[in-house]
UniProtKB/Swiss-Prot annotation:
GO CC annotation terms, alphabetical: extracellular exosome; histone pre-mRNA 3'end processing complex; nucleus; P-body
Protein name, per record: Y-box-binding protein 1
Spans annotated as C5-methylcytosine binding: 62-67
Annotated site, Important for C5-methylcytosine-recognition, chain positions: W62
Biased composition (Basic residues): 141-151, 238-247, 276-288
SUPFAM superfamilies tied to this protein: Nucleic acid-binding proteins
PROSITE patterns reported for this sequence: CSD_1, CSD_2
């Protein structure tokens, strides 16, 4: 038993000998040991081929990215070695296709091919990835940015969401978190075309409480009034268009109402619908100076009908008597 225990330890280092053998046999070019070393180098070269030299430095003479092949000039022997894109082991991660740049220094293994020497396991000096050809397409790492720019296109939605922010611009007691959320909306208002559309529409809805002199429905208190004079100055061009049309409609209506008052006794019912219409039309700011005139006329109109109404029953009583 003691003899068997002594014989077993020397048996362990025996398998280590073949592992060291390939390293020594590679430079000698042994056929049997070289095949085991080519196991890793053969697949990119496209088959089991003899290795002529390893870790050879050379400069790329030219490389066609479209066809996927080129030639490398060895620095030691000044020979041209054929290179295929499949032989490139470490490609530039930013490039789609495997390629080598013209005039680039490359480290590779020389292998025997069908028509001559070929390169295999092509990498940069020291095993670094290859730089690649400048004509090779880069990977589109910037695809995400145009997708981020997409949301600002919906300016109308942004303005609808930011209307509440404009109403409260004058409020001083605002937490910092809300103020930061409103800043991007302000930045998106810079394009002029998108500024004109919402502001041109807003005065129609925001003005009625001011011109109709109804303060109960006014939601915009301090901040809304501060923003209105600015909008008036910015959009003066829109006013004359609205001034021309509605005043022409007023005059015939007022004249017709005066004639009806003289000829008809029950005029109060007919005057109520036009008053509502006028109030709707007065929503525009342009008609502020014109508001007192129709109001005086309305007061005289409302004062006249009761006199006629009182005369009418007196006449009826006289006829009855």
């Amino acid at each position: 038993m003691s003899s068997e225990a002594e014989t077993q330890p020397p048996a362990a280092p025996v398998p280590a000998a073949p592992a060291a053998a390939p390293a020594d046999s590679k430079p000698n070019g042994g056929s049997g040991n070289g095949s085991s070393g080519l196991a890793s180098a053969a697949p990119p070269a496209g088959g089991d081929k003899k290795v002529i030299a390893t870790k050879v430095l050379g400069t790329v003479k030219w490389f066609n990215v479209r066809n996927g092949y080129g030639f490398i000039n060895r620095n030691d022997t000044k020979e041209d070695v054929f290179v295929h894109q499949t032989a490139i082991k470490k490609n530039n991660p930013r490039k789609y296709l495997r390629s080598v740049g013209d005039g680039e220094t490359v480290e590779f293994d020389v292998v025997e091919g069908e028509k001559g020497a070929e390169a295999a396991n092509v990498t940069g000096p020291g095993g670094v990835p290859v730089q690649g050809s400048k004509y090779a397409a880069d990977r589109n790492h910037y695809r995400r940015y145009p997708r981020r720019r997409g949301p600002p296109r919906n300016y109308q939605q942004n303005y609808q969401n930011s209307e509440s922010g404009e109403k409260n611009e004058g409020a001083e007691n605002i937490p910092e978190g809300q103020a930061q959320q409103r800043r991007p909306y302000r930045r998106r208002r810079y394009p002029p075309y998108y500024m004109r559309r919402p502001y041109g529409r807003r005065p129609q809805y925001s003005n009625p409480p001011v011109q109709g002199e109804i303060v109960e429905g006014a939601d915009n208190q301090g901040a809304g009034e501060q923003g209105r004079p600015v909008r008036q100055n910015m959009y003066r061009g829109y006013r004359p268009r609205f001034r021309r049309g509605p005043p022409r409609q007023r005059q015939p209506r007022e004249d017709g109402n005066e004639e009806d008052k003289e000829n008809q006794g029950d005029e109060t019912q007919g005057q109520q619908p036009p008053q509502r219409r006028y109030r709707r039309n007065f929503n525009y700011r342009r008609r502020r100076p014109e508001n007192p005139k129709p109001q005086d006329g309305k007061e005289t109109k409302t004062a006249e009908p009761p006199a006629e109404n009182t005369s009418a029953p007196e006449a009826e009583q006289g006829g009855a008597e």
